[in-house]
Amino acid sequence: MPGPIAGVRVLELAQIMAGPACGLMLADLGAEVIKIEKTAGGDDTRKFLPPDINGESAAFMMMNRNKKGLALNLKEQEGINIFKKMVEQSDVVIENFRKGTLEKLGIGYEDLKKINPKIILCEISGYGRTGPYADKGGFDLVAQGMSGLMSITGESFDKPPMKVGAPLTDITAGILGATGVLAALINRDKTGKGQRVDTSLYEAGIVHTYWQSAIAGATGKSPGPLGSAHPLTAPYQAFKTKDNWITIGASNQNNWMNLLNAIERVDLQEDDRFKDNNSRMKNLEALAPILQEELLKKTSNEWIKIFDEKGLPCGPINSITEMHNDPHTLDRKMVIEVDNKKAGKSKAIGMPIKFSDTNANTEIGAPNFGQHTDEILMQFGYSAEQIKDYRDKGIVA
């Protein structure tokens, strides 16, 4: 079934995580995404080994399913000419190079819009294309630190700084990039013109500080790390049980009472320290140990059953493999099986948005290096003889 943006052609001139995440989202929405890799080894994640499956990088296969692969040498003018010809017949270009890289190659936005005024260029960088840090390179770790995320992650100020375990700013920047592309496509339908979309890892980190920035803006003080707790409501955190850990979200008065009924401690509501959210936040250091003592009396599954019956939001702390095998994950098709020509069958994360009428096929495996080079070039009008000549000269692979 064609996806909601079927017919849109995307040239993904990006590698590793942020740019490929953007391309993956657009591919899962139905776009034709052509991943353009350098002829000298391809996307750097192809070398992120181990783990691998039959020599194919698991990291690369995760981020690049549902795409076609072309290996193109943009250091040679003939490679640039091929890229420009592709731009003529495409809708979107995604790139995550340092500022000025495309301009030096003669394929910056001003160059591209002369070739195709409708082209949309999505630039995902460390800090964006303007501002005092625009020329700096960026990585998720650095963006998490500079955006304030690492100052609110972890257990306390006296512990070493801690980053979020997942590459949060990379993935979020990719999603923001895809959102920007979709908005630019809608605007193009109205105006007939493309435009430049500019986002960054730094900004992707900042948007995850909404609550903490609200606190800092109101008080003038920066909130710190709270472990698994919430900066504005309580109790809302992880607790140890008889055999494991669970999370409990008793973040409003109704759920607070549901929790007290479930653990048979309604008496706590009579304690002025815990009567409302404001009181509970002020006295969380006293409240948490009381709740912890009660929750150690039963196993996680026992508590989850009780809390579910009360309608109290709760859940286990799953490992990644436990999440993969959770029946809800499987029912929602968030872990899918894809097929790679060399690696064979492997697991991938599925599309997190479902549509009633336009769900696209998401189960096409990532391309092997240069797998679709001939097919793609023929699609753009090149003959078999021309392609052979380009391959012999190292223009394509």
Could you describe each region identified by the protein language model?
Residues 33-36, 308-322, 383-388:
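Short, well-structured beta-strand/strand-turn elements
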Residues 174-194, 207-218, 260-267:
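Oxidoreductase and adenylate-handling cofactor-binding alpha/beta cores
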Residues 129, 158-167, 189-205, 224-231, ...:
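Conserved Rossmann-fold dehydrogenase catalytic segment
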Residues 343-389:
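Flexible, small-/acidic-enriched active-site or ligand-binding loops
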